[in-house]
Amino acid sequence: MFSGVTGILNRGHKIKGTVVLMRKNVLDINSLTTVGGVIGQGFDILGSTVDNLTAFLGRSVSLQLISATKPDATGKGKLGKATFLEGIISSLPTLGAGQSAFKIHFEWDDDMGIPGAFYIKNFMQTEFFLVSLTLDDIPNHGSIYFVCNSWIYNAKHHKIDRIFFANQTYLPSETPAPLVHYREEELNNLRGDGTGERKEWERIYDYDVYNDLGNPDSGENHARPVLGGSETYPYPRRGRTGRKPTRKDPNSESRSDYVYLPRDEAFGHLKSSDFLTYGLKAVSQNVVPALESVFFDLNFTPNEFDSFDEVHGLYEGGIKLPTNILSQISPLPVLKEIFRTDGENTLKYPPPKVIQVSRSGWMTDEEFAREMLAGVNPNVICCLQEFPPRSKLDSQIYGDHTSKISKEHLEPNLEGLTVEEAIQNKKLFLLDHHDSIMPYLRRINSTSTKAYATRTILFLNNNQNLKPLAIELSLPHPQGDEHGAVSYVYQPALEGVESSIWLLAKAYVIVNDSCYHQLVSHWLNTHAVVEPFVIATNRHLSCLHPIYKLLYPHYRDTMNINSLARLSLVNDGGIIEKTFLWGRYSMEMSSKVYKNWVFTEQALPADLIKRGMAIEDPSSPCGVKLVVEDYPYAVDGLEIWAIIKTWVQDYVSLYYTSDEKLRQDSELQAWWKELVEVGHGDKKNEPWWPKMQTREDLIEVCSIVIWTASALHAAVNFGQYSYGGLILNRPTLSRRFMPEKGSAEFEELVKSPQKAYLKTITPKFQTLIDLSVIEILSRHASDELYLGERDNPNWTSDKRALEAFKKFGNKLAEIEKKLTQRNNDEKLRNRHGPVEMPYTLLYPSSKEGLTFRGIPNSISI
C-alpha cells in the first residue's frame, strides 16, 4: 500500500487532520453502576461531564503520527512531533449524533514517509470516546482514515501509549516493516498477563470459567456450580474480571454491581439499547422487588389470573398497582415505554402479535405445531428416525426410558399409512424434551413447580401442515431412577374435559420448550458460544488483519449483554431462576446440553441434516433439500446462510490466494489454536474441530460465527414478545400435575377449565416479570446495525473488499423482497397459521422497536 510513495512529502509540509470524538457526558451511561443512579440523576447529567468542547483545546489531547514506511534506528516506524487539537469545527456534514470535530495539523517531512499509525494521549481527568482521525492533503496519496471507536482515558492509566492504525489491511507477513513492532506490541497489550483484578479503563481480554453465578457467602442455597473447566460441567469461557474469590468457596468469584469489561466492549455509541440494557437491570433491581411487595407483602392483588380475559386485560385495560409502586418503577425512560401508564395507576403491555388478529388461534393444534417450524424455537424439531423413540440416557443409572407411545396411538390418524411407511416417507416428526429434563425432574418437582419430561409426535399431512398425534408425559419412577420412567400418553380432543386435558398436555410441552429455548437455543447456542470468539479475536488478530475486519461487526456489544445476563438474568435468584421451570438448575442444565454441542453442526445445512429435517442433495441450494417444504425458518434461513457464505468466500479469497498462505498466517493460527484449546477448552479434544489448514476451513468457521451472531440470534430472540408476550401461548413454568379423575383439581377442570389451566401455568407475578424482560429483549435499538451494514464507510481502504461488501448488501435487499413475496403466497400455510402472523423474523432490515423482523449484525441484546 505504501511502497513507491516515499519521498513525496515536501520538507516541512503540514498535514491537515480532522479528529472526531464524543464527550463522555453525551455518551456514557455505563459510568452509572446502578439503576437507582440512573433514576436519581436523570439522563441529562450522565457521569462526570466535560462542560464544553473548549476543554479539549490547549494541551489537553496530543497526537503523534507514526511512519509506516520509514524506520528509526531500531527498525520501528519513525515518530512525528506531538501536536494538539487546535480548534472546533462547527459544522461537518458527516458528523453523527453527539459527535464533535476538531482541527489538527501535524508537522511532517519527506524523511518521515507515509503515516500508518498514531499515538494519542489524554491529559484531562475525564475520558472521552475517540471516533476517528482523517488525514488530508497528503501529496500524491490523498486521504488516510483511522477508524478508532475507543475510549481514551488519562495517559497515567496506560503503561503503553494508546495507538491506532490506518484502515489498511495486512496479513502479518505483509505488514510494512516499520509497523511490525507496533502491531505485535498492541496485541500483547490486549492480552495482559492473566493476573490481578481488572480496572475500568483497561482493555485486556482474557478467559475465565462461569464461577460468578452464585453467592455461596449468602448460604448453601445461593451457591451454584462452576461451569467450565470440568468434565461434569463443561461450558464456553467468559471474559475474565479477576474479582476476589468468595469467602466460603475459593473456586467461586465474588459478585458486585460492577462487572469489568474491556472498556471498548461497553456500549460506546449513542445506542438506545444502553437504555434497553439498563432497562433489563432495572427490571431486576427495581421492578421485581416492587412487584413482589404488591403480590406478597401488601396482598394488593391475587397472584392468580381468573380467566383468559384477565390475561388479555394486560394489553387492554392494564393492571392496577398502588401509586407508590408506580412511582418506583416508571421514571426510567425505557420503563415508561414498556409499562404504558395511563395516569390511573395501571401498567399496560402492548398486545403481542400472536393475538392481534385472532384471540384464540394459539389454542389450535395447527398453531401449536406450526410454531415448531416458524416460532421462536424452530430449530429443535426432528424427523422421526426410529419407533418407538428411545432415550440416550445411561440405562445403568436411569433404567429404560423408551417411549410408551404405541402404533395404536398413531395409525388411526396417518391417512392410511403404517408407522413404518410414515417414517420411510418422512411424515413423522418428534419434539423431544425428555432427556434434557429427566435427570433433574425429581429435584424440580420437589419444589413448588410440577412438570413432566415430554415427547410430542406429529404427522405431516398432504397440505404440508403438521398435526400433533400424541403427547407423552413422563415422571421419574417413584421407586428410584433405575426403574425408568412412569409415562402417560395423551391424544387430541376437540370437546369436553378431554379437550381441556389436551390443552394442558400441550402446555407441559411448551413449558419445556420455553426453558430449552431460553437457556439453550438462545443463551447457550448464541450468547455463550460466541463470547470466546470475541475474546480470542481481540487477543490474536490485529485490527489490521483481514479476518478481524470481517468478524468484528458481529461481536458488537456481545460481551456487554452477556455480563449483564450474569449480573441479573442467569444468576442465583435472577430473573430466569424466578420465572422459568428449570429454576436454580437452569444454567447447570444448559451445561449438560453443551456436552453434546458440535461447532460444525451450527452451520444451518448441517443442523438441518442432523435433525433429519433435510437430506443431502448436491443439486439443491446449500447442498440440502428440505423434508418439510413449507418450513419458514429453514427456507428463509438457507437463503441468508447462502448469502453470508458467498460474502465470506469473496472476502477470504482477496487475502488468501493459497492454503499455504493461510497455514503460514501466525496470527490466524494462534487465534484458532487458543479458541479451540482455551475458549472452548472443554471440547478441545473433539475430532470435529476444523483444522484451519485450508481456505475452506476458514470460510466455514467465519460463516458459522457470522450466522450464529446474526441470523440465528435474530430467529430465536426477536420473536420472544410476539409469541411469548401471551403467557397462555408460551408458559414458562407449571405448578400442578395433570389432574386425576376424582380429584378436586379434576372437578375444577370440568367446571372451570380456564381457571384450571391458569392455576397450572405461570402465575401473575412471574408473568409480569417475564413479559417485562422479553419485551426489552425483543426490541431493536435506534442505531442498530443490521446485516450488510457497517458503522463506518471507511472500515477498510481495500476497494475490492468494499465492492464485495456492497454486493453482499444488495443480495440481502433482494432476498428481503423474495421473503415478502413468499409471505404473500397463501398456499404456504405455515408462514401465517391460524394466528395470521407472517414469518418475518429473517427479514434482514428493521426499524426501531418491537418489529418482529430484522437481523442485527451481532448479539447486542
From Swiss-Prot:
Domain of life where this protein originates: Eukaryota
A Gene Ontology biological process in which this protein takes part is:
lipid oxidation
Q: Give the organism, scientific name.
A: Pisum sativum (Garden pea)
Q: What is this protein called?
A: Seed linoleate 9S-lipoxygenase-3
Q: Which reaction does it catalyse?
A: (9Z,12Z)-octadecadienoate + O2 = (9S)-hydroperoxy-(10E,12Z)-octadecadienoate
- EC number(s) of the enzyme? 1.13.11.58
Q: Which cofactor does it need?
A: Fe cation
Its localization reads:
Cytoplasm
Which UniProt keywords are present, listed alphabetically? Answer: Cytoplasm, Dioxygenase, Fatty acid biosynthesis, Fatty acid metabolism, Iron, Lipid biosynthesis, Lipid metabolism, Metal-binding, Oxidoreductase, Oxylipin biosynthesis
Principal location class: cytoplasm
Pathway terms, separated by semicolons: Lipid metabolism; oxylipin biosynthesis
Q: Where is this region: Disordered?
A: 215-257
The cofactor remark states: Binds 1 Fe cation per subunit.
GO molecular-function terms, A-Z: linoleate 9S-lipoxygenase activity; metal ion binding
Biased region (Basic and acidic residues) positions are: 247-257
For this record, the Gene Ontology CC terms, alphabetical, are: cytoplasm
| InterPro entries cross-referenced by the UniProt entry | LipOase, LipOase_C, LipOase_C_sf, LipOase_CS, LipOase_Fe_BS, LipOase_plant, Lipoxy_PLAT/LH2, Lipoxygenase_dom_3
Which family, according to the similarity comment?
Answer: Belongs to the lipoxygenase family.
State where Fe cation binds.
522, 527, 713, 717, 861
* Lineage of the organism: Eukaryota, Viridiplantae, Streptophyta, Embryophyta, Tracheophyta
